[in-house]
Amino acid sequence: MALLIPHHDDPEGLYRSLDSVRPDEPCDVLVVDDGSARHPLNVERAAAHCQTQGQLFTLALASNQGIEAALNAGLAWIRERGYEYVARLDCGDRNRPGRIARQLQYLNEHPDVVLVGGRASYVDLAGTEQFVLPLPATHDEIMAYLRNNSAFMHPAVMFRTKVLDQTGVYPTEFPRAEDYALFWEMAKVGRVANIPETLIDYELDPDSLSLSGRRQQLQSRLKIQRRNSDGSRAARRGIARTMILLGTPYQAAVRVKSWLNPRSTP
C-alpha cells in the first residue's frame, strides 16, 4: 500500500501530514515534489517526520507542472512497483489514527469496491474543528450525489491500483477538478463507497484557493457534469447548482457549509 502526497513549496504542511502517519500504519509513503523553488523538499527532515511501518520514498519533478502531473507521476511510480492500493493525502491535511488500516480492512472485506473514501473534519489553521461534511456512503447514494459534486474528499480516498487500467489516470483537461473526473470514471466501472467515519482533518486555509482558482474549479466541474449528463432532472439540477455557485463568493459558500454541517460528527 502506498500513500501518495504531492508537495509544492509547503514543507511545514508536509511535515504535519507526515507526522499523522502513525508507526502502526501499514504503508509506504511517496512524496512527489512538484518542482519546488522557494522551499525545496528536504528529504532528511521529511524522513524525521515519517514514522510509518514502511518506507518513505521521494520523487522530484524538474519543474513545476501542476498537481495533475505530480499525481500522475506518482501513480506511474506506484504502478511500476506493483502496489495493490493507493491512498491519498495532501500537505497540511492529517490522518486520523487508524485511517489506513480501516480503509485496507474495508477493501479486503468488499472485493467489489474499487474506491473508498471517508469523512473529513474541516479545521482552521489553529487546528480547531469548524465542521464535518457528511458524504453519501453507498454506491447508489454516491452515483446520485455525483450529479452535484464529487462525493469524495480527495485526500481521504484509497483505491485499487488495478482500476486505473480501466479508467486511466488523472485527466489534465479539468484543472482543479481532476479528482472529480477520475472518481466518476471509477464509479462507472466498479462499486464505490464512503466509510461513515471521520478519517482525516482537512486544513481549511482561506488563502489556499484564489478566486480565479475557484472559478476554474467550478468551470471544470460544470464540464464534467455536462459530459456525464443523462438528461435527467437530477443531472439538470446539478448543472444549475454549479452555475449558481459560480456567482457565489467563496467565504459565503464556506459559511453555508458550516451552518448546514455542525461540528459534531464522529
Question: Across the structure, where does each feature detected by a protein language model lie?
Answer:
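Short, well-formed alpha-helical segments that are part of the catalytic scaffolds
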Residues: D10-P23, N42
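Acidic donor-binding loop at a coil-to-helix junction in glycosyltransferase catalytic cores
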Residues: R176-L182
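A conserved acidic beta->alpha catalytic loop
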Residues: D33-E44, S63, D90
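Catalytic core of nucleotide-sugar-dependent glycosyltransferases
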Residues: D140-Y145, Y202-D205, L211-A235
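Catalytic beta-strand/loop signature of glycosyltransferases that borders the donor
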Residues: R119, Y180, A193-L199
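Glycine-rich, basic loop-to-helix element that forms the pyrophosphate-binding segment
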Residues: L61-R81
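Short beta-strand-to-loop acidic/aromatic patch adjacent to the donor-nucleotide binding site
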Residues: Y83-R94
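Conserved donor NDP-sugar-binding/catalytic core segment of glycosyltransferases
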Residues: G98-Q130
